[in-house]
UniProtKB/Swiss-Prot annotation:
An example Gene Ontology CC term for this record: cytoplasm
GO molecular function, one term: rRNA (cytosine-2'-O-)-methyltransferase activity
HAMAP family reported in the protein's UniProt record: 16SrRNA_methyltr_I
Tagged with keyword rRNA-binding: no
Keyword Membrane: no
Record's protein name: Ribosomal RNA small subunit methyltransferase I
A Pfam entry, by short name: TP_methylase
Primary site of residence: cytoplasm
InterPro entries xref list: 4pyrrol_Mease, 4pyrrol_Methylase_sf, 4pyrrole_Mease_sub1, 4pyrrole_Mease_sub2, rRNA_ssu_MeTfrase_I, RsmI_HTH, SAM_MeTrfase_RsmI_CS
Transmembrane segments: none
The protein's Enzyme Commission number: 2.1.1.198
Keywords assigned by UniProt, alphabetized: Cytoplasm, Methyltransferase, rRNA processing, S-adenosyl-L-methionine, Transferase
């Protein structure tokens, strides 16, 4: 019986090709096959480094059906790599279902660390990095996005979001409206690329800068927002505790309204706590 292979989770550059580590290059050269989010994109990356390996497209629409097939190959002794289009796989990218299935099957899963847009942005933001929460992409629909931001408005930890270029302006508008125009934030754009910019200031200032400069609405974005003041977070925590008790005896809307009146916390922030 053959020894099972290894699934390597390989981080790839988010812009600057020089950020692909020597170890990552070695792994990509030696595995049997590379599972890639977009094989066309990954093929270009491999060509730059003179690497030729079979590729298998693994994305959000087929991961659940392909996982079993990939696990079978790993069990047979093949070692495979998983990459995303940019950065570390699984971080707002496919791969979770495969990694979970591999671990359940007793396959060794090992990280090959490297670039990550959220960590790169946080490291240069000047905002507290000892405690933070990563929210990925906010909902595309305005109502759902605002509801999510309302729930996060009193989060005391530094908040990190990804955002697309066609939504960056309206996202900053919603952030300023819901979090408060004076909340400090950072907008990091095109990190490690030629047109990299890192803007900082109040949400109101950033909203204006991005709205008035078309170039600042192009590319890939990481938004980092200062956490809420401790007293605001304490209100939310207490409000959610009281809401949980009250909703056992009252309709959710009535329980939230009463808990908000008792604690001074925003009513909408108490749902789902």
């Amino acid at each position: 019986m053959s020894t099972p292979g290894t699934l390597h989770i390989v981080a790839t550059p988010i812009g600057n090709l020089g950020d692909l580590s020597p170890r990552a290059q070695h792994i990509l050269r030696t595995v049997t096959m590379i599972c890639a989010e977009d094989t066309r994109h990954t093929r270009q990356l491999l060509a730059h480094f003179g690497i030729e390996r079979p590729l298998l497209a693994l994305h959000a629409h087929n991961e659940d059906t392909l996982a079993e097939r990939i696990i079978t190959r790993l069990i047979s002794g093949e070692s495979l790599a998983l990459v995303s289009d940019a950065g570390t796989p699984l971080i707002s990218d496919p791969g979770f279902l495969l990694v979970r299935a591999a671990r359940a099957a007793g396959i060794r899963v090992t990280p090959v660390p490297g670039p990550s847009a959220l960590i790169a942005a946080l490291s240069v933001s000047g905002l507290p990095s000892n405690r933070f929460t990563f929210e990925g992409f906010l909902p595309a629909k305005p109502t759902a996005r605002r509801d999510r931001l309302t729930h996060l408005a009193h989060e005391p930890r530094t908040l990190i979001f990804y955002e697309a270029s066609h939504r960056i302006a309206e996202c900053l508008t919603d952030l300023a409206t819901i979090f408060g125009s004076m909340r400090i934030a950072v907008v990091a754009r095109e990190l490690t690329k030629i047109f990299e910019t890192v803007l900082d200031g109040t949400l109101a200032t950033l909203q204006t800068q991005v709205a008035n400069d078309e170039n600042q609405r192009k590319g890939e974005f990481v938004i980092i927002v200062q956490g809420a003041a401790d007293q605001d977070a304490a209100k939310i925590t207490e409000g959610r505790r009281i809401y949980a008790l009250l909703k056992e005896h009252l309709p959710p809307s009535s329980a939230a309204k009463l808990a908000a009146e008792i604690t001074g916390a925003p009513r909408k922030a108490l749902y789902g706590g």
